[in-house]
Swiss-Prot record:
Residues 52-55, 62-98, 146-155 are annotated as: EIF4G-binding. Pfam families: IF4E (PF01652). Keywords: Cytoplasm, Disulfide bond, Initiation factor, Nucleus, Protein biosynthesis, RNA-binding, Translation regulation. This is Eukaryotic translation initiation factor 4E-1. Its main location: nucleus. According to the redox status, the Cys-125-Cys-163 disulfide bridge may have a role in regulating protein function by affecting its ability to bind capped mRNA. MRNA binds at residues 70-75, 102, 120-121, 170-175, 215-219. It comes from Oryza sativa subsp. japonica (Rice). EIF4F is a multi-subunit complex, the composition of which varies with external and internal environmental conditions. It is composed of at least EIF4A, EIF4E and EIF4G. EIF4E is also known to interact with other partners. In higher plants two isoforms of EIF4F have been identified, named isoform EIF4F and isoform EIF(iso)4F. Isoform EIF4F has subunits p220 and p26, whereas isoform EIF(iso)4F has subunits p82 and p28.
């Protein structure tokens, strides 16, 4: 099993400071440009507090195992937590929620594009599938964060194919999966799987399972794609 690495993928990280020194401004001033404004008006300044919007809004969902029953329909206990659409909102939420290693066994924590529910029955998910990898208990925190950053930061070439991601905490392991829209689009699925492994520096093979195949609950279920 691959070990965790602390390097982050290119992603929607914390926003850089917009402040610049006067020496930098002078170096970048073109020849003949007037240095001082004699109009009496202060030059426009960038607002360092301005939010950094994401390309898509995303929603965190939580499936509480304590709210499940054996008779309940699958997915009936999933509840939306909060929707965010800026880098700042993401970090505010992420820094104030339990990370996978702190979740109870049986919990599922999702991050999906807004208005897409993390269910097979959702029309956008219905024809898709998921890439999945597993790791030991308590070892998924860093990989979950890197997955989120790569996803909301639009680092995937086929990002439009991605519905969202989920981390699932089980008795002996934790699983992270990326859900996609169209399982039949092999080029997109292979690209997403390969890039995901690169972002995580994950060396083991991962498999892609089609949702329609997973519904059959076949113990001999095989991966449609492997990278």
């Amino acid at each position: 099993m691959a070990e965790e690495h602390e390097t982050r993928p290119p992603s929607a990280g914390r926003p850089p400071s917009s402040g610049r020194g006067r020496a930098d401004d002078a170096d970048e001033r073109e020849e003949g440009e007037i240095a001082d404004d004699d109009s009496g008006h202060a030059p426009p300044q960038a607002n360092p507090a301005a939010p950094h919007p994401l390309e898509h809004a995303w929603t965190f969902w939580f499936d509480n195992p304590q709210g499940k029953s054996k008779q309940a329909t699958w997915g009936s206990s999933i509840r939306p937590i909060h929707t965010f659409s800026t880098v700042e909102d993401f970090w505010s939420l992420y820094n104030n929620i339990h990370h996978p290693s702190k979740l109870v066994v049986g919990a599922d924590f999702h991050c999906f594009k807004n208005k897409i529910e993390p269910k097979w029955e959702d029309p956008i998910c219905a024809n898709g599938g998921k890439w999945t990898f597993s790791c030991g208990r308590g070892k998924s925190d860093t990989m979950w964060l890197h997955t989120l950053l790569a996803m909301i930061g639009e680092q995937f070439d086929y990002g439009d194919e991605i519905c969202g991601a989920v981390v699932s905490v089980r008795g002996k392991q934790e699983r992270i999966a990326i859900w996609t829209k169209n399982a039949a689009n092999e080029a997109a699925q292979i690209s997403i799987g390969k890039q995901w492994k690169e972002f995580l520096d994950y060396k083991d093979s991962i498999g892609f399972i089609v949702h329609d195949d997973a519904k059959k609950m076949d113990k001999g279920l095989k991966n449609r794609y492997t990278v």
